[in-house]
């Protein structure tokens, strides 16, 4: 699924910030 993958990417960005 692309949705969970997108959320994972956003989560990684949030942790980076």
Swiss-Prot record:
Keywords: Amidation, Amphibian defense peptide, Antimicrobial, Secreted
Keyword Lyase included in the entry's annotation: no
Residue numbers of Phenylalanine amide PTMs: 17
Domain of life: Eukaryota
Tissue-level expression: Expressed by the skin glands.
GO BP terms, alphabetized: defense response
Subcellular location(s) of the protein: Secreted
Gene Ontology terms: cellular component: extracellular region
Protein family membership: Belongs to the frog skin active peptide (FSAP) family. Phylloseptin subfamily.
Function: Has antimicrobial activity.
Protein name: Phyllospetin-H4
Organism: Pithecopus hypochondrialis
